[in-house]
Every structure is written in C-alpha cells, then in structure tokens.
C-alpha cells in the first residue's frame, strides 16, 4: 500500500480545490485502484486526500424482475464515458462473470439504454455524483441520482465495509441497524428533523422507515467512501426535442413556467437563464474563439427558458410543441425568436449554450482571483415549493438590486431551483454576497424550501443547514456521523462545523 500514498506536493495542487474555487490542505494523497486499497488507506490515515478517479472499472450487469438493466461500476467511472458506451451498446466486460455476460448479450439486443441523471458537468464521476446526490436539468422528469442507485459499497473510516442493496435494510422509525462485512452490527440513531417537500440535498436524507442505502447517497463523503455503485438504466427516449423560449421580462418567463408545467406531459427539463447570464454569453461569443459557435442572441432577448421534450415518437413531440407554443403566446413570449432543436446537431448546439454559462462564470472568477485570491464564486442552490416561485425570484431581484452586486442566474426553474451566482470583484463584494446568501437561506426556509437542492451543503454553506433545521438537528447529525466515523476524520467541515464535531468527540462522540 505504501506505493499508493504520496506526499501532497505542488504537483497535486489541483486536487486541493473544487469548482467553488475554494482550496484546502492535506499532508498526503492517494489514487487507489481497488476497494481493498481504499479500506487499507482509511484504516491508517487522516489529513489525506483519497482520490478514487482511477477506480473506473465496469464490474457487471444484471436484469431485475421487471427486466430493468442494473450496471455495477466503480466510483471513478466518468459520466460522459458512460453515456458514450451506452449509446454505442459497448461496455468493457473484462473480468465479468457468466451471468453478467449473458445479461450483456440481452443489453446489446435491447432498445438503447441511458442513465438519466444529467448534471451540467459531464466529466463528473459517478461516485461523486452519488456522494452529493447530483441531479441537473433532467431532474424535472427523472429526479436526482438517489432513485437510480440500487446498490452501494461504502468503506467506513476504520476500513470495514457496508454492502447495501436497495430494498433489503430499513429503519425502524428513526433507528437503523446495519451489519458490516466483518460481521459487526452498527446501531444508528437518525436525526429527527423533517425534510422539506421540495427538491432537496440539504444534510442527511432521513425519514421514518427509510431504506438504509438512502442515508449514504448525498452524505457528501462524511459517513464513508463509496467504492462501488449499482445504477439502474432506462430505455432511451425515441425522440428528444429542445425548445429555447425567449422573453423580454423575467415576470413573463416565470408566468410561462407556472403555466407550462401542468400542460406538458413529456417535459424532461425546464431550465432558465436570466439577463446577466445571457449578457455573459454575448461577451464570450465576441471575445473568445472558444465560444464563437454559440448562436447569436437577439438584442431583445432578456431571459430564456429552455424546455426539453422526451417523447415516444414525433407525433407526440409535435403535439407537445403545439401546447408549449400556445402557452408561450399566452405568457407574452417571442414566438418568432424561439429555437427548436429536432436533430442531434441542433441539440448539441443548445447543450453547448447551456453549459457555456457556468463555464464562463468560472473563467471570470479565475480571472478576478488573480487580483484578489481570497474571493470565490458564490452560487446559490436553493429551492422552494411550486407556489413560491414568483416570490423567491422577486426576493432575489429586490435584494440584488439593493446590494448593487453583479450576478448571473440560471438553473432548474421547473423545480423552482435557480442558481443565483454573485460575481464578487473584491473581498468586500464577497463578504456582502455571503451576507445576502444568509438572508436568502432564512427566507427560503420560511417559504418551506431547501438551502441546497442538488449540490449538497459542503463546507461553504454549512451554516445554512443550521438555519434550515436548527442547532439540535446539527448535533444529532454530527452524532450520527460519529457512530460511523468515531474520530470525525471523513469530510471534515462538510455539513456542520469542525468545532461542533470536535466538541462531541471530546465528550465521547455518539
């Protein structure tokens, strides 16, 4: 194992930061390639970055009783590679047993399969997607990562292992008993808070009689390290059309969203881009050759709502498009400026348009960090119930105008879930932006919403979780962590403060 452990030198600097542009520290780093290596590293080390990107094998395939294909993979499998292999119906089968090879033959003869979870970052690894319960644009129709995971292996802090299969272990009320690979029984007391009835990735997933596997999905790496996943595939839609609708005001776009949701039966995604986001794209198209292929935006286009339709055939898609057009006209949208993508080439152009926004913002923040390294991007991840969409958009607009901060917003308006990104120019902007986010967290909570809908709370927004659930819920969550990680060494600072965790460790933890 010693060859796997490396000192954390400047060579590995990129592994000490994430897309928030925040940085951390570590004494060492490793790139394990097997589950056994992960378990050995966990048993011995702290102050360590454990990178599972080289655990990227496909382990097997089976069909369940309903005929659905279930694919076992390691956590380092990259989403974009999985998509390519599924579309080509060619999976790497080295080391598969006979049952998996037989299922693979059926897979090749079956209609094309796909994995519906669709985060913007297609270079994401499946293990990381499970750790934060990723979702993305298609979550409007397909939900987040959680329901598409049927099995997990989770390496614990002491090197032991949990092998979890959906439908096999359930909580009794808020108490969960789990048996490890070594034969130990873990008795876990789950926090007592009630999760909001909105899109939510805030803190641990807990509910009465819950499936044990759901606790570890979205736990941000604080309870264990995912070393294996089993994911459920679905038959790919026969027809996919993308429709970009443009409006001259935000109010019209919100009205369109509220009106179109009950009308469309086959919408997979309803996405949003505000005036700030569109202006960034206009500048990038003019200034950078990398973005020259972006379609030109009409000067009158102030905001955009993108709708993706997943249909059984073109007749169904045409009917959905007719209903969408009727709502667009009623809401005051610009029918003459609408983009409709019916081919893969056109859809790829729209996909580039959608993904270019967050990429452009990250580039802008990187440029500003050269002047002030203390700043990072500030991106909200909050959601509210359907009835409060107009209210939360009005909250964002009013408070941003009062603050004078530069911003750009985009995201999953179909789920009432916008990413409002504040673009600080200096430390003062950064501080004011953080204060504004804290205000939003309180007001969104009062609306019955969630402070994090898909990214997970992580470190930067850990304080918002206490705003949402209260201090006692944080204590209960930290105690749950310590029942699985007694020294508090996994994902320190994620979800709750290191100070709270260390105080509980000193008092005997759980």
Per-range role (PLM):
Residues 1-71, 84-94, 230-233, 277-285, ...:
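N-terminal flexible segment immediately upstream of the FAD-binding catalytic core
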Residues 40, 44-45, 86, 96, ...:
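A generic structural signal for well-ordered alpha-helical segments
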Residues 59, 80, 84-88, 95-262, ...:
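FAD-binding subdomain of flavoenzyme oxidoreductases
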Residues 217-219, 225-434, 443, 447:
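C-terminal substrate-recognition/cap domain of FAD-linked oxidoreductases
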Residues 412, 450-457, 492-495:
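Short acidic/histidine-rich active-site segments
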Residues 438-476, 480:
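C-terminal structured "cap/appendage" subdomains that terminate the fold
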Residues 462-510:
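Activity-critical C-terminal alpha-helical subdomain
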